[in-house]
Amino acid sequence: MKEFDLESYDYDLPKELIANYPILPKEKAKLLVYERRSQKITHTTFEHVLDFFPKNALVVLNDTKVIKARIFGSKHAFLPSKTTEVFFHRFFKDNTALTQIKGKIKVGDKIFFDAHYHAEVLELLHNGQRLIAFYGNKTPLNQANILKLLEQYGHMPLPPYIKRADESLDAHEYQSVFAKHMGAVAAPTASLHFSQNTLEKLLKDFKHAFLTLHVGAGTFLGVETKDIREHQIHTEVLRIPKKSQEILQKSQEILCIGTTALRSVEYFKRLENPNQEAFECDIFLHLANPILHVNYLLTNFHLPKSSLLMLVSAMVGLEKTKEIYQIAIEKKYRFYSYGDGMLIL
């Protein structure tokens, strides 16, 4: 069936529609509103986004905070040049972390970040990840100090389709105004559309709940299996506070800000008796595993053959999704992380 064929999720996007910078002010970004019942499409801007939110809906937001996850070092202690790039993915345990390292590397290699801080390669994993340990003055660093090291020397992990180096504006624009808990290596991009003013209006006028899904590097990996149902999606760390769990359990109508919030809600609502706050979320939503508990979604325009495009298709239908994306291309909407948005009602 074509809805499970990977090639069905391909489309051509003119390169000039890939957004390399955000629209400022945020309210000026374009918004495509699609009402499924009437099939009506409205073209507007984020200045009016809250006007379209159903009044009784619970709005769910992901308050993860992006780490400056790209850090450069040298394989030599005297630091002639920092040309070795380490991309931090997530903590493993204690002072160790799963990373990607560009270039040739072997177990035992050291990467020096300055005269005091370095990392040592412990293991080369089959999936391309490298397990490394962080040290300060030859003493194992705790996780809080590793985050401080990344904050001091790291760079914002812009997605690979943004073809430029990170700049000072990315430190705040590639971060939502409600980002709180450090741990993501990619931004939950629908959240980037909210200015402080729009957020305050949302919190005042709508029921809302926060959760934390630390977006992983796997979010940029395309689906590679010909039959999308065979794809194994990445696992991400999810935390839902008890207060938010209680609100979610009571709510009949849910609007998610972004696919990360939607995946989190769907994962949580399918658990029989959740009795903890921390989870490992690995839910892959598509037409054979449809959305059951979320009614509305605010999202960006996603990459061809991506699991996120399949999620949107699970909500809208494959043919309608392709039709809407074609309209967005014709109307010169900007795509991907710094691009425009789509509200599905």
From Swiss-Prot:
EC numbers for this chain: 2.4.99.17
InterPro entries assigned to the protein according to its UniProt record, in alphabetical order: QueA, QueA_dom1, QueA_dom2, QueA_sf
Listed Pfam families: Queuosine_synth
Annotated Gene Ontology cellular component terms: cytoplasm
Family to which this protein belongs: Belongs to the QueA family.
Self-association state and partner proteins as the record states: Monomer.
Protein name: S-adenosylmethionine:tRNA ribosyltransferase-isomerase
Organism: Helicobacter pylori (strain Shi470)
